[in-house]
């Protein structure tokens, strides 16, 4: 009798634990359908830093694309779904946040060398990299080119990104009530020597590929009383 009770208790505990673990999965499975772009609220959107990444790739000796990232960056987006071409985006990047996963940390701090070296990002003298859009051109139902000014190392040059609208919610799942969410992917290529960053060219490539994955969320939408 005692053994049967113990087995029942163990099974009950396992079932209860499984139910708890399944709850987030069930909630995700019941996420609402994405909204049409025209249904999303107009206004200012801020970057969801938990769900955003900024990586870049550069050729190393023509053998591989060396990949690194910035972990400290921010962006804001102004959007009017009825006039997507009027969208504007601004971004700031902290060059001190560059990460390369350099494997020999005991040998040298390569991330710090890239961030602060006068021949690299020289963050002590130029602590911020900025991007400000100047034009958005639609290229498809969910795609556009975003042209803007990239300022780095005290030099400002135009850059064009190819952006894809991944989708949006008028009520972003797991967000506070009234918060909309949208997502974009974007890629672009710059010639680093245009900003005076020409160290080791051409052994280390001049062309740098930029890859952005971003989610933005709106401020809570205030519901007007009937």
Task: Please name every model-derived segment.
Residues 29-226:
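Low-complexity, acidic/polar, glycine-enriched regions of mature
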């Amino acid at each position: 009798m005692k053994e049967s009770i113990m087995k029942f208790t163990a099974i009950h505990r396992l079932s209860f634990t499984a139910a708890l673990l399944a709850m987030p999965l069930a909630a995700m499975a019941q996420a609402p359908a994405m909204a049409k772009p025209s249904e999303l609220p107009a206004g200012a959107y801020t970057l969801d830093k938990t769900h955003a990444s900024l990586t870049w790739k550069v050729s190393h000796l023509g053998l591989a694309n060396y990949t690194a990232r910035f972990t400290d960056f921010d962006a804001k987006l102004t959007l009017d779904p009825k006039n997507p071409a009027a969208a504007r985006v601004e971004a700031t990047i902290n060059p001190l946040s560059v990460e390369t996963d350099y494997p020999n940390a005991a040998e040298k701090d390569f991330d710090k060398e890239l961030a602060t070296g006068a021949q690299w990002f020289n963050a002590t003298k130029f602590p911020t990299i900025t991007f400000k859009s100047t034009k958005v051109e639609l290229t498809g139902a969910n795609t556009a080119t975003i042209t803007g000014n990239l300022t780095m190392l005290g030099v400002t040059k135009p850059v064009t990104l190819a952006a894809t609208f991944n989708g949006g919610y008028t009520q972003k799942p797991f967000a506070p009530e009234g918060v909309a969410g949208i997502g974009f992917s974007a890629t672009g290529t710059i010639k680093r020597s245009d900003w005076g960053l020409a160290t080791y060219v051409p052994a280390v490539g001049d062309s740098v590929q930029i890859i952005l994955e971003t989610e933005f969320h709106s401020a809570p939408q205030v519901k007007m009383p009937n």
